[in-house]
């Protein structure tokens, strides 16, 4: 870390390489300690139509899970939901599911909801969400197949990697790129300063 920033101990409770890169872009020193919580079980138990509430709940559970093992650290956790017509599109994990997701999203508007929280000593200090709205071009079967073979975005909600070739799939985007990638940076920076986790 440069002498420009003074900071307290921070942990990113995420295994996402994109979130790791975004955090690194801020010049922070931090540990990466992914949570062991069962996200699918939490999603199954969630019986509300409030999808933002689900995303915030997942972020909080991840942060609290890690915080109990690292009470001296400020824990940053996040969750990302890809939503269209009140349906959540989880990570496809395989080629055929990715094809199905892109077929369903083709030509339509959907949202990427990024949810964040900061926890210290098992206390929730800050929570936040931000939504980006994206519209895909009408995608041919040939385009879907060629894109998936090129990028294999099977670990990405929505079956695309917006940080890479995925940008070519869209005709309209409203919202910041870091929100689409799952870690809205300016709100996080302001929260870290306001909580005196980081000083300049």
Curated annotation (Swiss-Prot):
Signal peptide: none
Transmembrane keyword on record: no
Gene Ontology biological-process entries: nucleotide metabolic process
GO MF annotation: an example: nucleoside triphosphate diphosphatase activity
Keyword Oxidoreductase attributed: no
Its EC number(s): 3.6.1.9
Subcellular location: Cytoplasm
Enzyme kind, highest EC tier: hydrolase
Essential cofactor(s): a divalent metal cation
Keyword annotations from UniProtKB, A to Z: Cytoplasm, Hydrolase, Nucleotide metabolism
CC per GO annotation: cytoplasm
Residues at the active site: 79 (proton acceptor)
Source taxon at top rank: Bacteria
Reaction(s) this enzyme catalyzes, per UniProt: a ribonucleoside 5'-triphosphate + H2O = a ribonucleoside 5'-phosphate + diphosphate + H(+); a 2'-deoxyribonucleoside 5'-triphosphate + H2O = a 2'-deoxyribonucleoside 5'-phosphate + diphosphate + H(+)
UniProt xrefs under PANTHER family: BIFUNCTIONAL DTTP/UTP PYROPHOSPHATASE/METHYLTRANSFERASE PROTEIN-RELATED, BIFUNCTIONAL DTTP_UTP PYROPHOSPHATASE_METHYLTRANSFERASE PROTEIN-RELATED
Entry similarity comment: Belongs to the Maf family.
Role noted for this protein: Nucleoside triphosphate pyrophosphatase. May have a dual role in cell division arrest and in preventing the incorporation of modified nucleotides into cellular nucleic acids.
Protein name, per record: Nucleoside triphosphate pyrophosphatase
Organism: Legionella pneumophila (strain Paris)
